[in-house]
From Swiss-Prot:
Protein name, entry field: Translational regulator CsrA
Assembly and binders: Homodimer; the beta-strands of each monomer intercalate to form a hydrophobic core, while the alpha-helices form wings that extend away from the core.
Cellular compartments annotated: Cytoplasm
Coiled coil: none
Family: Belongs to the CsrA/RsmA family.
Keyword Repressor set for record: yes
Recorded superkingdom: Bacteria
Example of a GO MF term: mRNA 5'-UTR binding
Physiological role: A key translational regulator that binds mRNA to regulate translation initiation and/or mRNA stability. Mediates global changes in gene expression, shifting from rapid growth to stress survival by linking envelope stress, the stringent response and the catabolite repression systems. Usually binds in the 5'-UTR; binding at or near the Shine-Dalgarno sequence prevents ribosome-binding, repressing translation, binding elsewhere in the 5'-UTR can activate translation and/or stabilize the mRNA. Its function is antagonized by small RNA(s).
Keyword Cell membrane: no
A Pfam short name: CsrA
Length: 65
């Protein structure tokens, strides 16, 4: 895992077309802004896990049919 330190207003660049900017820090939370092409899906980890769980359930249902 790459670990980087950024201050508010500073940006990371991922690949050629994704930027992640630190917008603010409040206590133990940070606000980030992400610019990426529409074709790139961006989810919080817990939402991504739910999506994957639903896909797995759907695959099992289709396998049973």
């Amino acid at each position: 895992m790459l670990i980087l330190t950024r201050r508010v207003g500073e940006t990371l660049i991922i690949g050629d077309d994704i930027t992640v900017t630190v917008l603010g820090v409040k206590g133990n939370q940070i606000r980030i802004g992400i610019n990426a092409p529409k074709k790139v899906s961006i989810h919080r980890e817990e939402i991504y896990q739910r999506i994957q769980d639903e896909k797995t359930k759907q695959d099992h249902i289709l396998d049973e049919v």
